[in-house]
Amino acid sequence: KGSASRTPTRRAAAAAANRSTSDFSGCFTAMAMLSAFELFGLPEKFAIDLDQLEKAHERAILKVHPDRFAGRPAAERRVAEQWSARINESFDVLRDPVKRASLLCETAGHPVDAETNTRMPADFLMEQMAWREDLDGAKDESAREAVRDKARAKFAECESKLESAIDAEKDWTKAVDLTRRLMFIGRFLEQTSAKSSPML
C-alpha cells in the first residue's frame, strides 16, 4: 500500500494530522488512519533515510510535548499523550530494520509470523550453530569479536537483499524469508554481546 494509492480519506487524515495541536476535533482518529511512514512523511519502502526519520520524529514529538499542554483541559492532555505514544511507537518500528521489514510485509498481505513459524533452512541454522561453536571456542575477546563481525556482515547482507526484494522486486516470499533471517541474526548479536547491535 504505497502513498500513490492513498485514498481521499487518507489524504484528509494526513492534512488533519498536520494541523495545529489546538485543533483536537477528530485529530486522534485521523492519526490512527495513518501508517507509520505517513506519520513522518516518509515513503513506504525499506530503504529510508534514518536522519530524516530522526528529524521528523523530533518535530512531531515537540508538537505534543507536555510543556505545551500545561494548564490545558484534561481531554487535550490525554489526546496529546495518545499522540506521543503513537509517534514513539511508529518511530521505534521504522528505525529497526527487522520491524520495518515486518511491517512492510504485513501491509502487503504477507505477514512474517515469526512467533508461530520458526522453521528455517538447514544451512542457515548450521551457520548459526557454527558461530556459537566458534564463540565457545574463542580464547579471547578479539576472537569472539571476529565471530560477531561475521554475523554483522551477514546482517548487512540481508538488509541489502531486503531492500532489493521489497523496494525493487516486490518479491514478498523472498522478503518474508530474509526478514526472518534478519531477525535470527539480530537475536544472535543481542544474545552474544550487550554492546553489539544489529543497528550499528
Could you tell me what each predicted segment is?
Residues 1-3:
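Low-complexity, intrinsically disordered Ser/Thr/Pro- and acidic-rich segments
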Residues 12, 18-200:
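C-terminal accessory/regulatory regions appended to core domains
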